[in-house]
A protein has these predicted regions:
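Short, intrinsically disordered, charge-balanced linker/junction segments flanking boundaries
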Residues: 177-182
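Acidic, Ser/Thr/Pro-rich regulatory low-complexity segments at or just upstream of the first helical elements
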Residues: 1-114, 118-175
Length: 182
């Protein structure tokens, strides 16, 4: 099996965007592979740009103890709303990048996670699959209201300078599972 680097150098132009064709209980994930020059460079650049600064998150000790519960909530919401796999990976990345650029107080950590999931869903999922804010808030049984969720969503976008594109683990897995370009 070729490594990612070998594929990018030898035939990276075979791949351009990795779109998820669909996933449900009857279908397996399918990747569509399209031409692109310098795929390795592009994915590496996106990955580097999308890495959170863990040392900043480490300084917010309370986040690590709350993280397992929040990640489980995001996984449950992701499954409940039948969102695409990439949505969850991107949501966690958005949350981590936000927490590495902004001090997040305990009472707002869950709100930041839900907002990250909502942002991610708007970017990745078809418009008719994006959860409505009220449904998301009802699902998590939160004390937040729609207006605070909107404010957090805007704040995350502002702090991250509207930079939502990045390469996730899911993108690399999709690349590795692409049919050899035939």
């Amino acid at each position: 099996m070729q490594s990612f680097s070998d594929m990018a150098e030898d035939g990276g132009e075979r791949f351009s965007s990795l779109r998820f064709a669909g996933l449900n209980s009857q279908n397996s994930p399918q990747a569509e592979c399209e031409p692109l020059k310098n795929l390795g460079f592009r994915l590496q650049y996106l990955e580097e740009q999308g890495q959170p600064d863990i040392s900043v998150i480490d300084s917010q000790v309370h986040l690590w103890s709350m993280r397992p519960e929040l990640i489980q909530l995001l996984i449950d919401a992701h499954a409940s709303f039948n969102l695409l796999p990439r949505t969850l990976f991107l949501a966690v990345n958005i949350l981590d990048r936000y927490c590495s650029k902004q001090t997040v107080y305990e009472q707002y950590y869950k709100l930041a996670g839900l907002s990250a999931l909502l942002i991610s869903s708007k970017l990745v999922d078809p418009p008719d699959h994006t959860p409505h804010m009220q449904d998301l808030l009802k699902f998590c049984q939160c004390d937040y209201d729609r207006s605070i969720l909107i404010k957090m969503e805007r704040h995350i976008l502002k702090i991250l300078d509207w930079s939502m594109r990045n390469a996730t683990v899911y993108d690399f897995v999709q690349l590795m599972t692409c049919d050899g370009g035939s």
